[in-house]
Amino acid sequence: MPRPSVVVPYLPERIGRLHEIATNLFWSWDRDARSLFRILDRPLWHLTRHNPLEQLRRTAPERLAECARDTHFLRLYDGVVASLDRQATNADTWYAKEYPALANRPVAYFCAEFGLHNSVPIYSGGLGVLAGD
């Protein structure tokens, strides 16, 4: 059964790319990106089991507006956005160096036997990391 897309009811323009960060697994290995969501609402971050989309959906518009004015949050946010952009366009990667002719032909590998993160439910009926779900 397909899952409904997560709608974030309100996101101030100044931090509008939070949704983009939340939908890119980049946040799961980038410490500063995870810190953004932790700062946004630490109890909710834990309650949602570190699911940034669910957290954005459940965060009060007033809290989002407050973060959009907070200089510490904005400095961290701007750094995360810059890192995300660098990673998306950086030609200085192993793949780009080893396979320059394939730079514009990305590769995706999907296997339902591996769990990416608990916020990305993949159910295959197999054992492994998903067996506890």
Enumerate the predicted regions with their spans.
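Catalytic cores of glycan-processing enzymes that make or break glycosidic bonds
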Residues: 1-133
